[in-house]
């Protein structure tokens, strides 16, 4: 089961924000909902999210460039597998990940986009 206004898919619940904000705000908002920014597991999940967002605009996910070394890292601290999910766009110390259509893009973390939270569905 998922809370009201959340979408169920498999064993996960997803929530898409109505309005935009920056990446840090988005991350904290998900935490406040006892969830985290979306961490993609598969191409099928990306396709599902694309169907949910529909308009093709940028949507924040739980991906950020972390120093040192400037590697893409998910919000749980695990590294991104670039072979599975390549990221397009420039990368610097202030880069965060978003979904646009069927791909992941790098954007400045201060950019204002909608975001997606995810959590485990209650059994």
Question: Each PLM stretch: what is its role?
Answer:
Residues 1-123:
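Extracellular, disulfide-bonded carbohydrate-recognition/adhesion ectodomains
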